[in-house]
Regions:
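Membrane-embedded alpha-helical bundles that constitute the cytochrome b-like, heme-associated redox core
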Residues: 1-145
Length: 147
């Protein structure tokens, strides 16, 4: 880019955006299906996919934030009134918070239930705490409302 003002989002920013959306479109119905299934091989398979997709969304969101920090975003519409630009910035911030909250709470719910999680580059297991697991499950479900 020859100037310091971006006229549109880069192809990588667009990729992060649309890939995250596609993962969420797959992820949310899987979560609703999981709560209706009894324990079975099908439930384990769907839950494993749900966890892998969730951890992927977590990493993609972190990459998006790092990329956003080091790259230029297009300027907001100068003709828009101040409140509209402020709302746009707050909306982006809230979506990042919601994405990180829903993924982090899902991860912590699994870990406090005594399960070991594979984070692609390392495995993690912590001491069981079922009360905390229930609290993180509630946060996980409630944060879905804000996506």
């Amino acid at each position: 880019m020859t100037n310091s003002i971006a006229l549109q989002y880069s192809w990588l920013a667009k990729f992060f955006h649309w890939f995250t959306l596609l993962l969420l479109i797959a992820q949310i119905p899987m979560g609703f299906i999981l709560v209706r299934l009894d324990f079975s091989d099908l439930r384990i398979t769907i839950e494993n996919v749900h966890v892998i997709v969730g951890i992927s969304i977590f990493y993609i969101t972190l990459f998006r934030l790092i990329y956003k920090f080091f790259s230029k975003s297009p300027k907001l519409m100068p003709e828009a009134f101040f409140g509209q630009n402020l709302i746009a910035k707050l909306n982006h911030f809230a979506l990042y918070v919601a994405l990180l909250t829903i993924t982090t709470s899902g991860i912590l719910k699994k870990l406090f239930n005594g399960e070991k999680l594979n984070f692609f580059i390392f495995k993690l297991r912590i001491e069981d705490n079922f009360d905390l697991a229930d609290q993180f499950y509630n946060v996980h479900v409630l944060s879905l409302i804000h996506i």
